[in-house]
């Protein structure tokens, strides 16, 4: 299937922030590749939702932390749409254990999902992006990963490495019309009012300069901008979307 619309692959898009990103990009006119690792029903539900925007949605299940599966996800999307123009590396795992209690197997599993998946998928989608003279690669970090994630050292390592990858891709592929950026979200309890009002979030809310917590619209709106032609001069940046809890200078 060939299409004049741009196509985005959003990993981990069967729920939460990934689902919100899918809605925003569908509203902007992009075809959507929904990916999940286990819950096909949830992924199919998101696909049905985004089709209401008049775009084509394809569900491709698979674990991006497995190289073969990650490559198959990309190949399936490319075969269906002709190319993947936007890659959003949203899938992540954040198991908690002290540094000394983290096994080699768990360490590798975290790095495979949180870091290596971004490498494997970039290698799959970049050739067409370069050939077409346009592309967007968007990844995620996080406030805790930036600070040093207590009880999740492997996550901090992976997210810092993705930041390095982002800068390297921005420099190498910028001349070809491909941008690479990374988003560092703040506290995002989701769009469920009951969940957002949970007492455990009260302290975080009161400490935020905006006196609120993040919603999927905050993330989706930024990614929609980055994927537009107006966002083409934003490249190699870490974008803090946290209401001012973490500031750069």
Residue ranges: model-predicted function:
Residues 122, 158, 166:
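Active-site helix of classical SDR
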Residues 14-16:
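Conserved glycine-rich cofactor-binding loop
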């Amino acid at each position: 299937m060939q299409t004049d619309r741009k196509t985005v692959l959003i990993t981990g898009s069967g729920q939460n922030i990934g689902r919100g990103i899918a809605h925003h990009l569908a509203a902007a006119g992009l075809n959507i590749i929904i990916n999940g690792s286990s819950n096909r029903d949830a992924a199919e539900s998101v696909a049905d939702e985004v089709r209401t925007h008049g775009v084509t949605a394809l569900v491709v299940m698979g674990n991006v932390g497995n190289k073969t599966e990650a490559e198959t996800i990309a190949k399936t999307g490319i075969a269906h749409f002709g190319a993947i123009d936007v890659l959003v590396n949203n899938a992540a795992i954040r198991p908690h254990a002290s540094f000394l209690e983290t096994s080699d197997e768990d360490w590798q599993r975290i790095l495979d999902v949180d870091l290596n998946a971004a490498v494997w998928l970039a290698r799959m989608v970049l050739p067409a992006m370069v050939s077409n003279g346009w592309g967007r690669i968007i990844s995620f970090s996080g406030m805790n990963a930036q600070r040093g994630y207590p009880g999740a050292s492997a996550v901090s390592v992976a997210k810092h490495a993705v930041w390095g990858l982002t800068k390297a891709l921005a420099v190498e592929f910028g001349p070809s019309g491909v941008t690479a950026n990374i988003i560092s979200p703040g506290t995002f309890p989701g769009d469920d009012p009951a969940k957002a009002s949970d007492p455990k979030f009260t302290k975080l809310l009161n400490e935020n300069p905006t006196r609120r917590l993040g919603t999927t619209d905050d993330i989706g709106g930024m990614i929609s901008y980055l994927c537009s032609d107006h966002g083409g001069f934003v490249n190699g940046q870490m974008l803090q979307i946290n209401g001012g809890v973490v500031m750069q200078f």
